[in-house]
């Protein structure tokens, strides 16, 4: 099950972080923050090839004993990070990709909102509801 979903701006500050359960929120914030180094490393390793790709899924960034951290980057260099419970072995790579595509589509809807200023924290109820349903659906 996805236990944390984060949207990170191009300048590496959080636009949105949602975690379940909330008692481990600081732990998940730390995991998301440390994964940004791996994201930057993968992006720089891809170099120009990243621009030509339509699929911006970075895959597994790093596993821990209890969790796996996955990444995705948009064309505008906004990063999506998802922390998944390692005990859920039924969750496949293509399901993670699908979750990131849903997240990207919902993020695009937020960006198209004329009342949203790019770079501000995401406070959209529709976006939050989509993330919550995505986290519950995977359970």
Swiss-Prot record:
Q: Which GO terms describe its biological process?
A: endoplasmic reticulum to Golgi vesicle-mediated transport
Keyword annotations for this protein, in alphabetical order, are:
Cytoplasm, Endoplasmic reticulum, ER-Golgi transport, Golgi apparatus, Transport
What's the superkingdom here?
Eukaryota
**Mind naming one GO cellular-component term on file for this protein?**
perinuclear region of cytoplasm
Give its localization. Cytoplasm, Perinuclear region; Endoplasmic reticulum; Golgi apparatus
Q: InterPro entries per the record?
A: Longin-like_dom_sf, Sedlin, TRAPPC2L
Keyword field contains Cytoplasm:
yes
**What is the first-listed, main subcellular location in coarse terms?**
cytoplasm
What is the stated purpose of this protein? May play a role in vesicular transport from endoplasmic reticulum to Golgi.
Q: Subunit notes for this chain?
A: Component of the multisubunit TRAPP (transport protein particle) complex, which includes at least TRAPPC2, TRAPPC2L, TRAPPC3, TRAPPC3L, TRAPPC4, TRAPPC5, TRAPPC8, TRAPPC9, TRAPPC10, TRAPPC11 and TRAPPC12. Interacts with the heterodimer TRAPPC3-TRAPPC6A.
Entry similarity comment: Belongs to the TRAPP small subunits family. Sedlin subfamily.
Q: List the protein's name.
A: Trafficking protein particle complex subunit 2-like protein
Per the UniProt entry, what species is this protein from, by scientific name?
A: Bos taurus
List the taxonomic lineage. Answer: Eukaryota, Metazoa, Chordata, Craniata, Vertebrata
